[in-house]
């Protein structure tokens, strides 16, 4: 099943039957842009996953937007040349900035074929990147590779 505005609306309708979930749908559905959930640029998608960890949903949205604005016209190589302080200036912690740099470095050097690899192999490959753990690798499989 493809995730698009129509399927998202169906999901909202179904999930809104639960009072607790309905609360979150009402509170956050207007800030969720399904077209920008995760980038097809794998490095950017993993950077977004790193940003989302251990911050509130609302904070993650704000920081991801600032990060996207910062790198929007930059190549991966130019992103790697950014000082960690520049990444921190958009709300990313020093440690997460290091991990994001590791991700971009990996994709600068690697030609790994994620699409033709098994789930287990993709997870093994991703967790070899410092800063990417099992949870991030599994979220990458689900939301980016749609598996």
Please identify what each model-predicted range represents:
Residues 1-117, 121:
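N-terminal polyanion-binding entry modules of DNA glycosylases/AP lyases
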Residues 118-147:
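Catalytic DNA-binding helix-loop module of base-excision-repair DNA glycosylases/AP lyases
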């Amino acid at each position: 099943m493809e995730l698009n505005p129509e399927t998202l609306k169906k999901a909202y309708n179904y999930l809104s039957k639960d009072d607790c979930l309905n609360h979150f749908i009402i509170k956050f559905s207007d800030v969720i842009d399904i077209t920008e959930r995760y980038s097809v640029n794998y490095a950017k998608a993993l950077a977004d996953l790193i940003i989302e960890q251990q911050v509130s949903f609302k904070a993650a949205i704000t920081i991801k937007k600032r990060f996207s604005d910062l790198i929007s016209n930059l190549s991966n190589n130019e992103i790697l040349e950014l000082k960690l302080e520049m990444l921190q200036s958009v709300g990313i912690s020093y440690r997460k900035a290091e991990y994001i740099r590791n991700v971009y470095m990996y994709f600068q050097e690697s030609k790994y074929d994620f699409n033709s690899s098994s789930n287990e192999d993709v997870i093994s490959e991703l967790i070899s990147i410092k800063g990417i753990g099992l949870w991030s690798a599994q979220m990458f499989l689900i939301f980016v590779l749609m598996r």
